[in-house]
Amino acid sequence: MTIDANHYDVIVAPVITEKATMASEYNKVVFKVARKATKPQIKEAVEKLFDVKVKSVNTLVRKGKTKVFRGRLGSHSDNKRAVVTLEEGHRIDVTTGL
């Protein structure tokens, strides 16, 4: 089992929110992923980096918000999240890191 450097480019960061923490009770983990990452790439990266079996991957694109900063309009970038469902008996503790 070799870890490719591209796997680190696919998974950007874990998402630690109240909703993501509640999803962990159902064997689901939420990651912020690269915009161009596909579901098979995300599945392979999670399986190799964390040594777990992935059951399914669902992705969503969150649109960036428009904000006012110092009287000027600006915007946050769009970002992509992946909700990864793990097989029974597999766990990922996102607080430990890679």
Curated annotation (Swiss-Prot):
InterPro entries, per database record: Nucleotide-bd_a/b_plait_sf (IPR012677), Ribosomal_uL23-like (IPR013025), Ribosomal_uL23/eL15/eS24_sf (IPR012678), Ribosomal_uL23_CS (IPR001014)
Domain of life of the source: Bacteria
Gene Ontology terms: biological process: translation
Keywords noted in UniProt: Ribonucleoprotein, Ribosomal protein, RNA-binding, rRNA-binding
Entry similarity comment: Belongs to the universal ribosomal protein uL23 family.
PANTHER family: 60S RIBOSOMAL PROTEIN L23A
Name of the protein this chain belongs to: Large ribosomal subunit protein uL23
